[in-house]
Amino acid sequence: MTIQTNLIENLLFFLNYMELEAVRKSIVSFIKTEVHNRGTTGAVIGVSGGIDSAVMVALAAEALGNEHVFGLILPDSDITPISDVIDATNLCIKLNIEFRKIYINEPKAGFQKILDETENRLLQGNLVARIRMCIMYYYSGLLKKLVLGTSNKTELELGYFTKYGDGGADLLPLGDLYKTNVFELARHLNIPENITNKKSSARLWPGQVTEEELGVSFPLLDGILKRINELYCAVDSKKVYDLDEKIIKDLAEDFPSIDLDSIRGVYKLSRLNRHKVTPPPVCKF
């Protein structure tokens, strides 16, 4: 075992069977309690064919009963691989939940027709994510169910989601689990291998792969994020000159196999995107 592997294991909470069971029970209880306390009839979940939504649907069905979970499969035929649509459909059938499949190309085209043209694929991708959010909340109101988001701790700490898009949700049951742990939980829940073995992607543009985009594998990425939190807790920011550069230097020493540009990129995302997970500032009178 390499020093690098030892470091990752120390930084992350790799979970054994009993710990995964405790996580499962905790999330199931959380969903059940929140849905009951808010007086709603169940949950609406976007089912993408990816690992996060698969775990979310499985846990929601366990918590609420499959009859109280409604799945929405919202592909964009310009971007979404047909394998994702098939995997999402088969998962809903396997879990015996009601679902609808709605291609979002038509509303996307409607927006593009009236908006200024742009080649910026991030803007186009965010538009797609927000169209999905609108559909999710339409059915949330129609069915009197809560929208369960599928964002994990890695995405939340990086801000790797669309504000008021896939980040728009009533509950975030996976929000305290790093992506590495979501993979573990998926295997624990016997999520089909064609989903657990799939390369993660937000599907904001064709060919997008999360790890390739960020330049870091999930175990290392999660290790970096956890280390950033530890470094922030260990210092008094008022007494440390150029804190950002100090933390980047410490991260480079802790993760020598990762190039400095990738470390800077991860750190920059985690700092710049904090606004995504905090409420908009209110002017107090």
How would you describe each model-predicted region?
Residues T2-G42, L59-E62, H68-F70, L74-P107, ...:
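ATP/NTP-dependent adenylation/nucleotidyl-transfer catalytic domains that generate, transfer
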Residues S53:
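Catalytic nucleophile loop
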Residues V44-V47:
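Short glycine-rich or small-residue beta-strand-to-loop segments that form or flank ligand, phosphate
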Residues R130:
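Catalytic-core regions of hydrolytic enzymes
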Residues G50:
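Conserved G/P- and acidic residue-centered "switch" motifs that form tight phosphate/ATP-binding loops
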